């Protein structure tokens, strides 16, 4: 079983981790890190270390990133469907090997468009994006980093404009509810979001730079494979 070094965003995140109730594994599309081997490793780790776990994959908004990199809408949708299908296949196979049920375990952002809890948190985030220039700029910065990273992974590049960044930022905004308070959305009591890198926007949120708060029953952890020193902000 693969061992991971775990870093905590806050002391509260560490306390939630120590109770080992539930973890959400964040899996990014078009990110070389999330190959079949790594996806299997983190599922094994979650199964061994927590009472239960869920998996969060990108939603329809991930096509925005590809469109910003020059793909047509139809081509972007095709690539997203293929990538998500690939990731789901790896996840389902490993979940079964862990003797866990697949039902209600693998989620995408876009699965919750009609979820009242998701809608409420998302609306708060969008309102903040539209009224707080500092928050908006922080989201746009993350969008730029995501475009640069994914541009390398799909072997393409294009001039990035302010309009492009704002369109790409919809991906960031769609993910944020799961960082702030995933519990009512996925029906858990307390949980941690686990990812392979620090999240600068999340750090800014817990440092009270914006009028957004992480719920006390929600945490964020960074997983680093033992002996793997490549981790960086994305």
UniProtKB/Swiss-Prot annotation:
The record marks 175 as: Could have a critical role in the catalytic mechanism. Substrate binds at residues 171-175, 195, 200-201. One of its GO terms (molecular function) is aminoacyltransferase activity. Keywords: Plasmid, Transferase. The record marks 79, 89, 171 as: Could be involved in aa-tRNA binding. The keyword Transferase applies. Pfam families: CDPS. Gene3D superfamilies: Cyclodipeptide synthase. InterPro entries: CDPS, CDPS_sf. Its EC number is 2.3.2.22. Belongs to the CDPS family. It uses activated amino acids in the form of aminoacyl-tRNAs (aa-tRNAs) as substrates to catalyze the ATP-independent formation of cyclodipeptides which are intermediates in diketopiperazine (DKP) biosynthetic pathways. Catalyzes the formation of cyclo(L-Leu-L-Leu) (cLL) from L-leucyl-tRNA(Leu). Can incorporate various nonpolar residues, such as L-phenylalanine, L-leucine and L-methionine, into cyclodipeptides. This is Cyclo(L-leucyl-L-leucyl) synthase. It comes from Staphylococcus haemolyticus (strain JCSC1435). The lineage of its organism: Bacteria, Bacillati, Bacillota, Bacilli, Bacillales.
